[in-house]
A protein has these predicted regions:
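Extended, low-hydrophobicity segments enriched in charged/polar residues
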Residues: 1-103
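Acidic, proline/glycine-rich low-complexity IDRs
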Residues: 87-150
Length: 150
């Protein structure tokens, strides 16, 4: 778990070195409080699940239905203003990042959203998520974060 923690801290450090764009730039620098960092093992099958719909049709109205927690699928397909991606795009991206023949070699952790102001935007409305994925076969980390507002 310590290597995952270091990878998450490094990912946030990299975000701080980049030019930020977006509609909410209230934090010019993302901070990390390591003492508040918590994680839990995340099931591989659940991580790659591609079937949870986040919309419910109620008469002529499309209503957002938030899952009990943000899933990777939700983060990819349901940002505040939508994306033009297909399920096929989701599968292609995952095949590039995590070739299916090696998925059993993945170690996935889901992180809490109380240790960094990176999550403040998402806490306002859309939601937050952060996963650290270690690919034992390729000896690399992939960090996926989500935190947006309108």
């Amino acid at each position: 778990m310590q290597s995952h923690k270091r990878a998450v801290i490094e990912a946030i450090s990299i975000l701080n070195s980049r030019v930020r764009v977006g509609n909410s730039l209230k934090h010019p620098h993302f901070s990390v409080d390591e003492d508040k960092m918590r994680c839990a093992v995340y099931d591989i099958e659940q991580f790659f699940c591609d079937g949870n719909s986040s919309w419910k049709i109620d008469g002529n109205t499309k209503v957002r239905v938030s899952p009990s927690h943000m899933t990777y699928w939700w983060a990819f397909f349901e940002p505040p203003y939508g994306v033009p991606y297909s399920k096929e795009d989701f599968h292609k991206l995952n095949h590039l990042l995590f070739p299916s023949q090696f998925r059993n070699d993945l170690e996935i952790f889901s992180w809490n959203d109380d240790f960094s102001n990176y999550f403040d935007d998402g806490k306002e409305w859309w939601g937050t998520a952060l996963w650290s994925i270690y690919d034992k076969w390729m000896s690399r980390f992939v960090i996926i974060g989500a935190s947006l507002t309108d």
